[in-house]
A protein has these predicted regions:
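Bacterial N-terminal signal peptides
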Residues: 9-19
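N-terminal carbohydrate-binding accessory modules
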Residues: 24-76
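The substrate-binding groove and active-site-proximal loops of carbohydrate-active enzymes
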Residues: 48-58, 81-99, 146-167, 179, ...
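Aromatic-lined substrate-binding rim segments of carbohydrate-active enzymes
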Residues: 62-140, 253-269
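Catalytic-core region of carbohydrate-active enzymes that cleave or remodel glycosidic bonds
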Residues: 111, 258-270, 301-409
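Polysaccharide-binding and catalytic clefts of secreted carbohydrate-active enzymes
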Residues: 138-303
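Aromatic- and carboxylate-lined catalytic core of secreted/periplasmic carbohydrate-active enzymes
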Residues: 358-493
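C-terminal beta-sandwich/jelly-roll accessory domains of carbohydrate-active enzymes
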Residues: 445, 449-474, 479-548
Length: 548
């Protein structure tokens, strides 16, 4: 018998009723200790080994292709949109059947959810707003350019727009609470998507102009000092000079988002964050906006302004679509702060990016989620992978498959500051990690046997190393014990005090469901004489070292 969407939702409703009799799990929350952060799920640290669906897969009949890709990627979390246009196509009339279907299917697939609220802004534009918003400029005003002409972007000064978006978001949060207050399948919310404005520094409408020419709010002055020697107080231009337009726009957008987030959290207090299309992380010194990124978005230079204007937002996170290794590392450096959790909620799914899983996870991130983990017939090449099949998901599946059996242990170690990570740089050079009492050297393009100087006439290089794709993540679980997972890399560990060092034991294995280490074999001889040589098939090693 063919099952209709109505029948499916009815059946799902029964599932929710049954679940309501169970004891509620603790609500997810973001916690901070000693400048480190953890997402607590079911009362314990939880790292999202995730994947983000395509933008148009947020409909019940499209989900099968999403779940298939998430399964092949071995992901524990799906990020997927919930669009304003789909839950409130007619003003005041809400339809949450998609949300019901999504949550029920996530439970069936044993996957957690991060819901992406595509409301007023998606990639700076209003394309996911309902039609009754899109075409009513009188009620829902667009930003105005310097000549007073409306542009593509809805104004953050639009009071009616804010009121309507907030109403829809609150209704969504209330519904999530209704169906998920026990099982906590939904663990986090993204509020809007890649906000700001391309090509325009800010809104020049009457309300915006009045605020721009008024004194900078005290909460902003407290968080964001002037990058140049200007007035300590005054108007935006007086305090921030050439940076004033971007900073004011960031404040306006952040305040708008913050009001929506707070209203939603007042109903159901899930963690919430904002993402952004990043600016050049290598630019030093950071220059004023010059049409080179989305002005007003939560780029690294205005995180402080977002903290001031939107305290209901837990953190700002980068969407990364540049494979340049120096920029990637610099971006993580800019966003990983004592007051800002590191997360990469969106990244290219291209082959050049796979190696960064080890770097991001090793640095203690709470989320690593490539974009387009979805078998829908759409490829975002050249930003992403050419194909939308298993050739795209398999590399992530191998890595996540290595981490997932120890996901709770890894999450705990990361929160305790015990984890480290590297990704092979574009220069292909060895990298060092300063561990507690030890130094690790990670090199790349090495054969498993011998040292390069032994075989100077050998010109061959290991297969699949034509481009940088190596990486290693480590956790120091005791003074002289480590968990190592990686690919296409050689790992050596030496004592930090210079004493001769040797391997005491190198076990290959895994953690079982109860958290017990299961050894499959012990490496020795050729497998350890020249460091620990990791191939393209990620393995998990439990390593003990000593000095003599």
């Amino acid at each position: 018998m063919k099952t209709t969407v109505r029948q499916l939702v009815t059946a799902l409703g029964l599932t929710f009723v049954v679940a309501a009799g169970a004891a509620a799990a603790p609500i997810p929350e973001l916690v901070t200790k000693d400048g480190r952060h953890a997402l607590m799920v079911d009362g314990a640290p939880f790292v999202m080994f995730g994947g983000q669906a395509q933008n148009s897969s947020n409909y019940p009949l499209a989900l099968d292709k999403v779940w298939a890709a998430i399964k092949d990627a071995n992901a524990n979390t799906l990020e997927i949109p919930v669009a304003w246009e789909q839950i409130e196509p007619t003003e005041g009339k809400f339809d949450f059947s998609y949300v019901d279907t999504l949550v029920a299917q996530a439970r069936k697939n044993k996957v957690r959810l991060v819901l992406l609220w595509f409301g007023t802004w998606k990639n700076t534009g209003p394309s996911y707003t309902p039609e009754w918003v899109k075409f009513n400029n009188a009620r829902f005003p667009r930003m105005l350019d310097q000549e007073g002409k409306p542009i593509y972007c809805l104004s953050p000064q639009g009071e009616e727009t804010l009121k309507a978006d907030k109403k829809a978001f609150v209704a969504l949060m209330a519904h999530i609470k209704k169906i998920d207050d026990v099982q906590r399948t939904v663990i986090m919310m993204q509020v809007q998507n890649e906000v700001g404005t391309y090509g325009y520094a800010r809104d020049y409408g009457p309300k915006a102009e009045a605020q721009f020419n008024a004194p900078v709010p005290a909460e902003v002055l407290k968080h964001k000092k002037s990058p140049v020697a200007l007035a300590a107080t005054g108007t935006w231009k007086q305090v921030y000079g050439d940076y004033a337009d971007e900073y004011f726009h960031a404040y306006s957008v952040a305040k708008y988002i913050g009001e929506i987030a707070k209203a939603g959290r007042d109903v159901y207090n899930l963690p919430m964050y904002v993402n952004n299309s990043i600016r050049d992380s290598l630019e030093e010194p950071v220059k004023p906006w010059n049409k080179n990124f989305a002005s007003g978005g939560p780029t690294f230079d205005v995180i402080d302004i977002y903290k001031a204007a939107a305290p209901a937002i837990d953190f700002a996170a980068p969407d990364i679509y540049s494979p340049d290794s120096r920029k990637f590392v610099a971006t993580l450096d800019k966003f990983q702060r004592p007051d800002n959790a590191l997360a990469v909620p969106e990244m290219s799914n291209g082959a050049d990016y796979v190696r960064y899983a080890y770097l991001v996870l090793g640095r203690g991130a709470i989320n690593f989620s490539p974009f387009g983990i979805d078998y829908a017939d759409y490829s975002n090449f050249p930003l992403g992978h050419k194909a939308t099949d298993k050739t795209m998901t398999a590399p992530y599946g191998k890595i996540f498959g290595a981490f997932r059996p120890m996901e709770r242990q890894w999450s705990k170690w990361a929160f305790e500051g015990r984890t480290y990570g590297v990704a092979e740089g574009d220069d292909r050079q060895p990298q060092k990690l300063a561990l507690k009492g030890w130094n690790a050297t990670i090199s790349f393009r090495e054969w498993q046997f011998g040292e390069a100087q032994y075989f100077k006439d050998v010109k061959d290089l290991p297969a699949n190393t034509e481009k940088p794709n190596g990486g290693v993540a480590m956790a120091q679980i005791a003074d002289n014990e480590f968990i190592i997972v990686g690919q296409h890399a050689r790992v050596k560990i030496d004592s930090a005090d210079g004493k001769p060092t040797m391997w005491a034991r190198v076990e290959e294995g895994r953690y079982d469901a109860a958290g017990k280490w299961i050894m499959e074999r012990n490496w020795n001889g050729d497998q350890t004489d020249y460091g620990l040589n990791l191939t393209g098939n990620p393995v998990v090693l439990k390593v003990k070292v000593g000095t003599y």
